[in-house]
Design a protein with these regions (language model features):
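C-terminal beta-strand-rich structural cap/linker in extracellular carbohydrate-active enzymes
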Residues: 262-269
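Active-site and adjacent substrate-binding regions of carbohydrate-active enzymes
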Residues: 36-87, 93
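Short, solvent-exposed coil/turn linker segments
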Residues: 29-30, 34, 236-238, 266
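Catalytic core of carbohydrate-active enzymes
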Residues: 255-262
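Active-site-proximal substrate-binding groove within the catalytic cores of carbohydrate-active enzymes
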Residues: 73-255
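Active-site-adjacent "subsite" loops/lids of carbohydrate-active enzymes
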Residues: 1-55
Length: 269
């Protein structure tokens, strides 16, 4: 049961005894909240199977999850069986509020993470929070997932230390940053995050963090500051871990629109 309400069609045809879901009036969305375990999920999974086979869909965008882990496993199997490589993308607004029972989105959906490919967390997330909040509650990295930013465009400098950008075209234009990633060959590199305990580049400042992407003969370093004011740091570089000779290496910052100006330094500058 429930208080009813919601879209006009529901009120006209169902009367009462149901729980209306979040909906978009312009799209005539007569959505209702169902139980987390329901025979409707059989209908949902069979529908996905039909779409994979006949429409060749290559993944799902899920805006919060209304079913259990068992159903998610079935969804994953249907996608993998019909279109290997299909992706599942989970979006969630921050559920840590009185209306949603102060539930961290990462904690709320943790049981689904093994079957997902990426996260988009999301409206109302606080990108001014500490780095450990970013890592655990936003990035997806501890769980083997990638993430993207949304609320007010996120923070591109902090986000890059975790491989995150805003999602085109919702908040800003990350294309200039993507171009630099592609030019470096980020897909062929090994990511050594500031949290890993083996970061070859550090700053000596616990609030200014560095993540390194290492390839044979070159490396890319991202710096993210959690300081409230401009701060100068000197990079501490483990040249042996990078496989680079400091006598033959320069540090270059390419110009990236709305991100940074160009610069060039020698080791020790």
């Amino acid at each position: 049961g429930g208080p009813g309400g919601g879209y006009s069609w529901l009120q006209e045809h169902l009367g009462s005894g149901y729980l209306a879901a979040w909906h978009v009036p312009e799209n005539k969305d007569a959505a209702v909240v169902n139980s987390g375990v329901s025979r409707w999920h059989n209908f949902y999974v069979e529908g996905l199977d039909w779409l994979v086979k006949h429409e060749k869909i290559d993944g799902l965008y899920i805006d919060d999850v209304a079913f259990d882990r068992t159903t998610m496993k079935r969804v994953r199997k249907v996608l993998d069986r019909g279109n290997p490589g299909a992706m599942i993308d989970l979006h969630s607004a921050n559920q840590y509020n009185p209306r949603d029972g102060f539930a961290s989105s990462a904690n709320l959906y943790l049981e689904h993470f093994p079957f997902l490919n990426r996260l988009w967390f999301g409206e109302y997330f606080d990108y001014d929070s500490a780095s450990d909040y970013w890592l655990v509650e936003v990035s997806g990295i501890p769980f083997g997932l990638m993430g993207e930013m949304l609320e007010k465009g996120g923070n591109p400098w902090r986000g890059m230390t975790m491989g995150m950008t805003a999602r085109l075209p919702w908040s800003g234009d990350p294309a200039p940053l993507w171009k630099v990633w592609d030019g470096f060959g980020i897909q062929q590199s090994r990511m050594l995050g500031w949290w890993s305990g083996e970061a070859p580049v550090t700053t000596g400042d616990s609030a200014i963090l560095a993540t390194t992407w290492r390839r044979p003969g070159k490396a890319m370093v991202s710096l993210g500051s959690w300081r409230d004011a401009d701060t100068k740091v000197t990079l501490r570089i483990d040249w042996k871990a990078l496989g680079l000779d400091p006598a033959r290496t320069r540090l270059r910052a390419p110009a990236i629109d709305q991100f940074q100006v160009a610069g060039s330094w020698g080791p020790g500058d």
